[in-house]
């Protein structure tokens, strides 16, 4: 397996990984304007991109996912809850679905809370075993923090859902499993994010202050001091729902 993490605009972290041997790659959370980088890195690895995934409809940056998928002829994926919401064709993801890229396999975990459509991606290298190597956590779990719950409205209800998601879907994963989040310090998508670009489930269970709280305390803490919403959020979300990035992006 090859793996690339790309720091991008708005403290976003994007990903490219795949199987060089069988020449297939996966791109995750591509920021508009970075499409050439993904194409060039995939070419260097000798692994054409076959899957492009957004972990949710982003509110803080324009997605380059649809454009990258069009340029390379790959499937573009969002969670199935976006059917009827997104104004263009995409390949829907369902909880428990498995995507293949040669010997690299991606297991989809539906993780609502930050947004209703959020997913995390547990990644395996079948040449080395059937256990996951890492999980891409999108805006659900960050290093030292968790995703904000208010972007879809009903922040207390979403915060409670995020607590349930974290406890049942992510913290039950092996403690040694690496996590790669969708943002690092400087992002508007959460409060108190670390500048570290990666962690493990076990480290976060021990040191992430949001993960040792009761459900009631978690909801209260997460909704007490919500950061300002991302600049131009409404326009960004609308563009990402249409799959058309403005020329100013």
Task: Name the predicted role of every residue range.
Residues 149-156:
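Short glycine-enriched, charge-decorated loop/helix-capping segments at active-site entrances
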Residues 82, 89-148:
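Active-site-adjacent scaffolding segments
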Residues 128-129, 133-134, 144, 156-249:
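Divalent-metal (often Zn2+) His-rich catalytic cores of metallo-beta-lactamase-fold enzymes
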Residues 17, 29, 56, 68, ...:
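Divalent metal-coordination and catalytic microenvironments
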Residues 1-48, 121-138, 144:
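Conserved beta-strand hairpin/beta-sheet module of binuclear metal-dependent hydrolase folds
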Residues 27-30, 48-58, 77-80, 110-113, ...:
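Active-site neighborhood of phospho(di)ester-bond hydrolases with catalytic His/Asp-centered motifs
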Residues 34, 57-62, 83-86, 116-117, ...:
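Active-site environment of divalent metal-dependent phosphoester hydrolases
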Residues 34-77:
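Active-site metal-binding motif and surrounding structural segment of the metallo-beta-lactamase
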